[in-house]
A protein has these predicted regions:
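C-terminal cap of thioredoxin/glutaredoxin-like
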Residues: 5, 9-13, 32-35, 43-56, ...
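A short beta-strand-turn-helix
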Residues: 11-29
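Flexible, active-site-adjacent loop/turn segments at secondary-structure boundaries
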Residues: 18-19, 102, 165
């Protein structure tokens, strides 16, 4: 999906500071830079969810760790930054992954009113969510993800790193699963 090959390795290693599914000590650690308004990011994320489920069933929960990092491309996706802020504000209430899924599922509707509706649907404290949404600390967190992506050569989304090495293959289940399994050996 993304042919930028200027860097082949992840220069900001995974850490407990990231949004993590799984354990950092897993055999395979995937880091995806994504944009909530980008259909390719949504498709890539959904593909990774399917692969993670299949590999966890086959090899156990500790086999694969998935990390999502924000990379809103505001020049082409005007609502991507605010959607990322909504995800981080939801994270402040322990609901990052549910909001992440919701934003990707509804990426055509990311205006402010919808973001509040999604937060309400997830049972978030709406006054707190609205207060947290514009907080500079959340914006700084997103900017850190973007800066790390840029350092690692990311210019477009989605961008995927498998065990810190840039994945440049096809975003199809067979190819991606083969690359993940190969990285575990």
């Amino acid at each position: 999906m993304n042919d930028d090959r200027s860097h082949s390795s992840l220069l900001v290693p995974p850490s407990s500071h990231d949004w993590i599914q799984g354990v950092l000590g897993a055999k395979v650690v995937l880091v995806m830079y994504g944009d909530y308004q980008d259909s390719k990011s949504a498709n890539g994320y959904k593909l990774i969810k399917v692969i993670k489920q299949e590999l966890s069933a086959s090899f156990g929960e500790d086999y694969l760790c998935f990390i999502f990092r924000h990379f809103p491309q505001t020049q082409v996706h005007p609502h991507a930054q605010r959607a990322a802020q909504a995800a981080v504000a939801a994270a402040a209430q322990g609901q990052f992954w549910l909001m992440n899924d919701t934003l990707f599922d509804h990426q055509q509707n990311l205006e402010n009113g919808y973001l509040v509706e999604y937060a309400n649907d997830l049972g978030l404290d709406i006054p707190k969510f609205l207060k947290d949404l514009p907080k500079q600390v959340h914006i700084d967190r997103i900017n850190q993800d973007v800066a790390g992506g840029i350092q690692s050569g990311v210019t477009a989304t989605p961008a995927l790193f498998i065990n810190n090495i840039r994945y440049i293959g096809c975003w199809r289940i067979t190819e991606l699963m083969a690359a993940i399994v190969a990285a575990s050996h």
